Amino acid sequence: MSRVRRVLCRACLALAAVLAVLLLLPLPLPLPLPLPRAPAPDPGRVPTGSLTLEVSRLQPDDVFIAVKTTRKNHGPRLRLLLRTWISRAPRQTFIFTDGDDPELQLLAGSQMINTNCSAVRTRQALCCKMSVEYDKFIESGRKWFCHVDDDNYVNPKSLLHLLSTFSSNQDIYLGRPSLDHPIEATERVQGGGTSNTVKFWFATGGAGFCLSRGLALKMSPWASLGSFMSTAERVRLPDDCTVGYIVEGLLGARLLHSPLFHSHLENLQKLPSGAVLQQVTLSYGGPENPHNVVNVAGSFSIRQDPTRFQSVHCLLYPDTHWCPMKNRGKEAFQ
């Protein structure tokens, strides 16, 4: 009996020793939880990441503003632009025309570019000028390309402020569509008789639009060195539509709609007078619709300033030498 008791005691001691060892061992760590995954990018969302550095660095000379005009408009339209907003952005602005003009060349210098495109307002002539604009921008090395027409007033400060909220390395296509729905076009497939239907948004050139350098470089296979014109023939559309076709239809990027761009196609009198000076571009109706102008007062009558561009300019830059002194007073809006 005592022998059995001794065996049991030894067993108990051995068990106690094992338990003691187990208690001294470190507890196993729990398995690590899986790292949270970043949400998938939303294709419709405006990219906003890592913009602080670019905002602080964006300078006026980072922007390439292309003004499309024609020889017959050098007098009535272009001189007004040179007198107003271009005088505040001379190094940013490049004038693309279709005829030599020694007098204008003296005013604009090397910023005036004769595209040698046809002066007839056809789809092919418009695309010819856009092709030259694109190539000159790529050659310039600047960060942003902005296209406007010769009936646009550009507010350089508002433009720079808007572009500073984006990165030029990202795919940015910024402007205002003239339609409330995507355009539908027939895309002719090269090397065959087949065709496809494509739908895409485009920013109307009459209001102006901007492209980041990152996106413009991706457009190169369809836009550089004359390729733009052959691309336009695939859909048989004018220049601004072709830009939208390349960006949305071929590259899969998206137009970012902005209400700050304005063309003569909209009712400009509906633009609140208090918001006029914050817009990026303005326009006017012209002889066929002379009353379609922004509602802004000032020191010039409608007869003196039918486009209202001089009035807008003097409100933005009252120190301009030809602006009336009273324009520097209190309120100028109606």
UniProtKB/Swiss-Prot annotation:
One Gene Ontology molecular-function label: O-fucosylpeptide 3-beta-N-acetylglucosaminyltransferase activity
Transmembrane segments annotated in the record for this chain: 7-29
The enzyme's E.C. designation: 2.4.1.222
InterPro entries: Fringe (IPR017374), Fringe-like_glycosylTrfase (IPR003378)
Sections of the chain in a coiled coil: none
Glycosylation site list: 116
Topological domain spans for side Lumenal: 30-334
List of residues binding Mn(2+): 151, 264
Main location: Golgi
Protein name: Beta-1,3-N-acetylglucosaminyltransferase radical fringe
Organism: Rattus norvegicus (Rat)
Gene name linked to the record: Rfng
